[in-house]
């Protein structure tokens, strides 16, 4: 059964299992999310639910979006995302989705916007090997040849220096170590994309497990 929740990255810490082994975990404020709209195959062509996360004041929302929230009968939210679910009929508008939607031991996929690193060269951005560093060498960190003389142009997709980070990244197959529905917290093994307080989309893993 497909399911998902929105959250914010709080930071990293460690917990200990029953054998005393330290496990690095990311602490995520997961929800509460509120169902804003249900979509069904009969009316929309597919099954899905739209959820809102992080309530905001009405004055911070534009009029079209405020009308959308008023029609649903819910308070305005900063973030709206849609999850495609085969069981969308089980949800009701206004229903809360909390951190207990995922249980310890479940595998999840976490999507976020990676940290922006600004302009970066080929070594940092793509892992290129550098040139000789000894005295007399005039080739250290440059990318080298870009193309052959024949085409007389650079092909699309060539790895070059440029902007690094600030892109959508999904990390698959992370394990839920612990959940705390009372404080809306999820502890997920390992690291997840993005900075602290960055928005995360958490869904059960497409690879199962």
UniProtKB/Swiss-Prot annotation:
GO terms of biological process kind: translation
One GO MF term: structural constituent of ribosome
Keyword match Ribonucleoprotein: yes
Keyword tRNA-binding: no
Record keywords, A-Z: Ribonucleoprotein, Ribosomal protein, RNA-binding, rRNA-binding
Gene Ontology terms: cellular component: cytosolic large ribosomal subunit
InterPro entries in UniProt: Ribosomal_uL3, Ribosomal_uL3_bac/org-type, Ribosomal_uL3_CS, Transl_B-barrel_sf
Domain of life: Bacteria
Pfam families per UniProt: Ribosomal_L3
Subunit relationships: Part of the 50S ribosomal subunit. Forms a cluster with proteins L14 and L19.
Described function: One of the primary rRNA binding proteins, it binds directly near the 3'-end of the 23S rRNA, where it nucleates assembly of the 50S subunit.
Classification via PANTHER family: 50S RIBOSOMAL PROTEIN L3, LARGE RIBOSOMAL SUBUNIT PROTEIN UL3C
Protein family per UniProt: Belongs to the universal ribosomal protein uL3 family.
Annotated NCBIfam families: L3_bact
Name of the protein this chain belongs to: Large ribosomal subunit protein uL3
Gene: rplC
